Amino acid sequence: MIIAVDFDGTIVEHKYPAIGKEIPFAFETLRKLQTEHHKLILWSVREGKLLDEAVTFCRERGLEFYAVNRDYPEEEKNLNNHFSRKLKADIFIDDRNLGGLPDWGMIYEMVSKRLSYEDLMRKYESEYEPEKP
């Protein structure tokens, strides 16, 4: 799958333009998804120097993205007159999701088992349903 991942508020705490503290298990989960052959795209509002800082921050923690703010590494805005900021990703992981950002353990479970929120809620409801007398 192609997975677009936001930076501020998703991988690190939201301190833009500074880089916030790492969100627990974000890097571990993303590296694990890469080992399972998912393509990760960093999808951020950051540009220029601020974007370079975010990419370096991730690289220093062992996370190298397939592409950054584009669909594929070779894509060049100046050579593409129909360039769109909208990615062709299968999944978007972003703190601005409806319902907010789940914890990274839940994100991994949803991606690896291809579960929707509805599937996940149904699963947890059945697991925690009290026994009837």
Predicted regions, residues:
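Alpha-helical substrate-recognition element adjacent to the catalytic core
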Residues: M1-P73
